Amino acid sequence: MIDRYSRPELTAIWSDGARFALWLEIELAVCEAMEARGRVPTGSAATVRERATGKLDPKRILEIEAITRHDVIAFLTHVEELAGEPARWLHLGMTSSDVLDTALDGTFIPAGAHLMVHWLSLIHI
């Protein structure tokens, strides 16, 4: 997004930081489901959540992406830097599209809601 043409609230929703935070939540939700089915060691998701939530560094992820040339691999590599061994259970059984498409859908909802509230505020009855 071009900042000078964007509402600050929308710039925040579409920022790299927000995108990567949403990716983490998606990965953790799947990891928790895998734990419930006995496919992942119990506590893996909680450990990753504790060690990585609020600590993601978008600049570091982009640095890794410049090397790997793959956005999701760069993200997962950075999460592993933060969380260590339990992060290896993230992305199990998933494709990059599973994360990207779900996150895109999850971004449209708050962005659309913000725009609707804004547009409705412009209507004078």
Regions found by a protein language model. Give the residues of each.
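A helix-coil-helix interface module used to build multimeric assemblies
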Residues: 1-123
